[in-house]
Amino acid sequence: MTELKKTPLFDLYEQYGGKVIDFGGWALPVQFSSIKEEHEAVRTKAGLFDVSHMGEVEVTGAQALNYLQRLVTNDVSKIKDGQAQYTAMCYENGGTVDDLLIYRRSEDQYLLVINAANIDKDIAWMEKHAIDGVSITNVSNQTAQLALQGPVAENVLQTLTEEPLADIKFFRFVDGVNIAGVNVLLSRTGYTGEDGFELYCLAEDAPVLWKKLIEAGKEHGVVPCGLGARDTLRFEAKLPLYGQELTKDISPIEAGIGFAVKVDKEDFIGKEILKKQKEQGAPRKLVGLEMVDKGIPRTGYEVYVDNQKIGFVTTGTQSPTLKKNVGLALLQAEHSELGTEVIVHVRKRQLIAKVVATPFYKRGN
């Protein structure tokens, strides 16, 4: 059996009561207290996540912008220094290689943040399409990433830095910020549907940064959070998870992130199919389902109308915020109208559900 990969914070998990599981070959905490408590803390106060398993790749050189424009679906020429952009890499058939964030440091320096399970595959894909004048460097092992998410995140973080955090707007970042004596790339981004920050630092600095953030957040109700709450939070906000809402067989248009696909820019991998899907409508659509009958729609459960299979559940749970059994499902587009009644095959039972609006949770609602 191969040994699980560990983040620089692994030794701290036990100290904070973390329950460790195998997550795609990584030893990561699924929870510290309980998923519901951690979820609630992020929605009302704030939570601190270790997301150091994510991959970081530097793309540099005179041709970096041209290279990225061909590699990804969004228009990288639209971001300025200090801005971040959400985007995807696709195959020629429109299926998704990965979804990712791009940070622009300068015209010839970018940092890409990719999903942990896809690091090797993504880098191989990037190298396969590399051009002269571009360097691709995997800095994942020397980089740690923490996420402080929730309504009090800014107040807590401000006690540890002189950087005016209110000036860092959503999807903006500042490199070289001193937070509690640690040098951090600080980004106003996240994967929870809440306000918050993602903090990138050297792996060896991560434990001290984690401790300082927990300490500073104590009186504000900040708690350590695991992967379980990260998943329920992102699910309520309809943020896709690679391997569920996005796969090599599911396009960004189908998954509802068409805003990150700019078909009017110059040629990029997958453009032809994605342009067609955007203009004529994709054959499938990601929708929300709410159970009418009692049961929880889990990943992979099949969905039917009139005894015909029309799709499957990508993610489902009892929403901690709504207290309802809900799911995201990829359905044939003609069955995606709000209010449509469908049958979800939950184990051996056939249960009624209806198509509902998403996201299930929006900040400020």
UniProtKB/Swiss-Prot annotation:
Reactions catalysed, semicolon-separated, are: N(6)-[(R)-S(8)-aminomethyldihydrolipoyl]-L-lysyl-[protein] + (6S)-5,6,7,8-tetrahydrofolate = N(6)-[(R)-dihydrolipoyl]-L-lysyl-[protein] + (6R)-5,10-methylene-5,6,7,8-tetrahydrofolate + NH4(+)
Q: Name one GO molecular function term.
A: aminomethyltransferase activity
What Gene3D superfamilies is this protein classified in? Aminomethyltransferase beta-barrel domains, Aminomethyltransferase fragment, Probable tRNA modification gtpase trme, domain 1
Q: Answer yes or no on keyword Transferase.
A: yes
Report the record's disulfide bonds: none
Top-level taxonomic group: Bacteria
Q: Which GO terms describe its cellular component?
A: cytosol; glycine cleavage complex
> What does the record give as EC number?
2.1.2.10
Q: Name one Pfam family in it.
A: GCV_T
* GO BP terms: glycine decarboxylation via glycine cleavage system
Keywords on record: Aminotransferase, Transferase
InterPro entries, A to Z: GCS_T, GCS_T_bac, GCST_C, GCV_T_N, GcvT/YgfZ/DmdA, GcvT/YgfZ_C, TrmE/GcvT_dom1
- First-tier enzyme category under EC: transferase
Q: Does the keyword Transferase apply?
A: yes
Q: How does it assemble?
A: The glycine cleavage system is composed of four proteins: P, T, L and H.
Regarding protein family, the annotation reads: Belongs to the GcvT family.
Function, as annotated: The glycine cleavage system catalyzes the degradation of glycine.
Name of this chain's protein: Aminomethyltransferase
The species this protein was found in: Halalkalibacterium halodurans (strain ATCC BAA-125 / DSM 18197 / FERM 7344 / JCM 9153 / C-125)
Q: Which lineage ranks, top first, belong to the organism behind this chain?
A: Bacteria, Bacillati, Bacillota, Bacilli, Bacillales
Gene name on record? gcvT
